[in-house]
């Protein structure tokens, strides 16, 4: 099956999570007017009193043609990925309770100035880089027992 990759926007992505970006976002000045603070861009949610972790994940580029065959979700916390050097990357997401609902399966490509924050329980493809090795600032939950993985029928990503 083929899955069309769409440009990432907050409107298209809102059911799956938050788009972390400054474009079209409100800000206020701090530090004597030298800094624009784009405040509260994503809801970080961590359950069961676990720690919130800030990490760097170094992702390798995926092989082409790009096909996916599994999704994962994290029931106990949100998960945010922000490329550290402005790289474009691709995310694949779906809704669903016990298993991914393939009728909600979507793929998005960022513009190089966006990160994503997956809501708790949103099915998504494991992180990968798009065209080159990419370092992602990652914000998620510490602890164990927070990753469900499900196989899905193979999908080939198609770029317009």
UniProtKB/Swiss-Prot annotation:
User: InterPro entries, from UniProt?
Assistant: RmlC_Cupin_sf, UAH_cupin, Ureidogly_lyase, Ureidogly_lyase_bac, Ureidoglycolate_lyase_dom_sf
UniProt entry tagged with the keyword Lyase: yes
Which SUPFAM superfamilies does the entry link to? Answer: RmlC-like cupins (SSF51182)
Q: What does this protein do?
A: Catalyzes the catabolism of the allantoin degradation intermediate (S)-ureidoglycolate, generating urea and glyoxylate. Involved in the anaerobic utilization of allantoin as sole nitrogen source. Reinforces the induction of genes involved in the degradation of allantoin and glyoxylate by producing glyoxylate.
Q: Which cofactor does it need?
A: Ni(2+)
* UniProt keyword list: Lyase, Purine metabolism
Q: Name one GO molecular function term.
A: ureidoglycolate hydrolase activity
Reading the lineage from the top rank, the first entry is: Bacteria
Q: Sorted alphabetically, which HAMAP family does this protein's record hold? A: Ureidogly_lyase
Q: Which family does it belong to?
A: Belongs to the ureidoglycolate lyase family.
Q: How does it assemble?
A: Homodimer.
- Which reaction equations make up its catalytic activity? (S)-ureidoglycolate = urea + glyoxylate
The alphabetized list of GO BP terms reads: allantoin catabolic process; purine nucleobase catabolic process
* Regions that span the bilayer: none
Name recorded for this polypeptide: Ureidoglycolate lyase
Q: Which organism is it from?
A: Escherichia coli O6:H1 (strain CFT073 / ATCC 700928 / UPEC)
EC number(s) in its UniProt entry?
Answer: 4.3.2.3
- Is Oxidoreductase among this UniProt entry's keywords? no
Q: What does the record give as its pathway?
A: Nitrogen metabolism; (S)-allantoin degradation
């Amino acid at each position: 099956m083929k899955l069309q990759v769409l440009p990432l926007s907050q409107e298209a992505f809102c059911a799956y999570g938050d788009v972390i970006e400054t474009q079209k976002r409100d800000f206020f000045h701090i530090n004597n007017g030298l800094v624009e603070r784009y405040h509260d861009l994503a809801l970080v949610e961590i359950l069961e009193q676990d720690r919130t972790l800030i990490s760097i994940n170094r992702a390798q580029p995926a092989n082409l043609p790009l096909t996916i065959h599994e999704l994962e979700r994290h029931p106990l916390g949100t998960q945010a990925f922000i490329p550290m050097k402005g790289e474009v990357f691709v995310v694949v997401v779906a809704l669903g309770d016990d298993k991914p609902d393939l009728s909600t399966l979507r793929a998005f490509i960022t513009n190089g100035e966006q990160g994503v924050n997956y809501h708790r329980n949103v099915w998504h493809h494991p992180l990968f880089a798009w065209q080159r090795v990419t370092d992602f600032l990652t914000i998620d939950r510490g602890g164990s027992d927070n990753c469900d993985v499900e196989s899905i029928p193979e999908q080939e990503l198609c770029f317009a």
